[in-house]
């Protein structure tokens, strides 16, 4: 993989959303200094007010360098001491994944985006076939205005794929989805897909938006 990502999903305690965002901003400053690209994305429809704290690296070596830097970091010792003394949220899940497109770099995600995310659990031995289907769909979705990124799960998300559609704003998302209605190439693709062997199950489908870096 090129673009390697770790995702930490947090939920703020009641009345603590602002404090959690402040804590994430402090963590992001440390992670950035140690070589990671950081984005903070709030879930929207289809979720339960979760916030993704996302770390990205260009490759495995950069990923490992950041991990090693954390081991002896006084900044992290101080950060976790402060956070533990006044916790503002609870981590609900964490997982790692790699972008199947090896030309994509972590810096390609710098900026603010709106996301539509589908999470799939693939049947054993069917990962390559699912990627091929995803890539066929990718061409149609990009013609409709989406930027498509496909992640294959690693630690914490074995047998999972995250199919991510990215847009500059909500208006762009709406315009893209409008192009995928009845009579469109996407509608035809979905009809054909319904006749294929089932090799994966969709387990989650939600929108999100960048709220910090």
Protein language model features and the residues they cover:
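Short S/T/G/P-rich N-terminal loop/turn motif that feeds into the first structured element of a domain
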Residues: 1-213
């Amino acid at each position: 993989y090129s673009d390697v990502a770790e995702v930490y999903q947090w939920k703020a305690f009641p009345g603590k959303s602002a404090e959690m965002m402040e804590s994430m901003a402090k963590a992001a400053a440390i992670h950035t200094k140690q070589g990671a690209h950081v984005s903070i994305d709030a879930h929207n429809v289809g979720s339960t007010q979760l916030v993704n704290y996302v770390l990205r690296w260009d490759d495995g070596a950069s990923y490992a360098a950041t991990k090693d830097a954390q081991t002896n970091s006084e900044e992290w010792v101080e950060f976790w001491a402060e956070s533990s003394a006044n916790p503002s949220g609870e981590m609900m899940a964490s997982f790692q994944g790699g972008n199947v497109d090896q030309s994509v770099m972590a810096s390609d995600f710098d900026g603010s985006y709106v996301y539509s995310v589908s999470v799939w659990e693939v049947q054993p031995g069917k990962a390559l076939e699912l990627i091929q289907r995803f890539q066929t769909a990718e061409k149609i979705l990009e013609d409709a205005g989406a930027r498509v990124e496909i992640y294959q799960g690693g630690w914490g998300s074995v047998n999972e794929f995250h199919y991510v559609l990215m847009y500059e704003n909500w208006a762009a998302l709406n315009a893209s989805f409008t192009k995928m209605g009845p009579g469109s190439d996407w509608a035809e693709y979905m009809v054909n897909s319904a006749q294929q062997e089932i090799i994966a199950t969709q387990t989650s489908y939600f929108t999100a938006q960048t709220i910090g870096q």
